[in-house]
């Protein structure tokens, strides 16, 4: 694993199937079936790749592993999915959702982050480079001291990004 500081998205100016862009995610879909991507790197990804929230939502619906019904921020019923990682190619870019929390309003859990990183390790060698943000520490509210030992087990083709002066 290599640590870098800066903006992860600056590495993705043109689509590249050999570089996997990993973002941290929750498992909640809105009433239109779109993955809720309203904060942090997920929001940045949603803004950079319009329609990706619907694309991931459709993928989760096809996967059909609804864990529980939940009430979203606007009091509408939605579904929460447990998926660990979900990947594909969107508009020419290899991209992966790494689940760090079940519901967007809750903090990340160390167990889910660990489980998702283990699943990620199973697929990283299919890519020249794998770029991800430090999982679970921003909006996930987990201490960096608990996450670092997990990400340090990632292979050297994995680049873990933090914004300068954050982690």
Can you name each region flagged by the protein language model?
Residues 1-167:
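Macrodomain-like recognition of ADP-ribose-binding/processing modules
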